[in-house]
């Protein structure tokens, strides 16, 4: 992995941690949605993750097809361009199910660079 990719992966992991902090006290999509600040902060950080994916090299993405890079970038586009029409239940599913998986995959990529 190139140094550029390594630092982007680290940044993505930090961004995931922010989302976790902003959303950890909530038990449902509706509960999170009612808190404008935390909801908006989490959504903005999903956009940031999508932007970070766009900066990764094609080589890294091709070698790590277990991560659906296009789906992550597509979420960024949906949130950035259709913010008022997003389904909060889908966002909640992403936060509670998909984000921990992505974090694990990115940590594995980070560890590969240390070998």
Where are the predicted features?
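Solvent-exposed interaction patches of small proteins and small membrane subunits
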Residues: 1-115
């Amino acid at each position: 992995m190139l140094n550029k990719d390594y630092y982007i992966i680290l940044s993505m992991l930090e961004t995931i941690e922010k989302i976790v902090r902003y959303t950890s006290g909530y038990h449902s999509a509706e509960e999170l949605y009612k808190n404008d600040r935390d909801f908006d902060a989490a959504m903005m950080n999903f956009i940031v993750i999508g932007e970070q994916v766009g900066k990764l090299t094609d080589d890294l993405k091709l070698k790590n097809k277990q991560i659906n890079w296009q789906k992550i970038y597509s979420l960024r586009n949906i949130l950035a361009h259709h913010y008022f029409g997003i389904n909060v239940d889908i966002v909640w599913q992403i936060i509670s199910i998909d984000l921990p998986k992505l974090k694990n995959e990115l940590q594995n990529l980070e560890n590969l660079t240390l070998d």
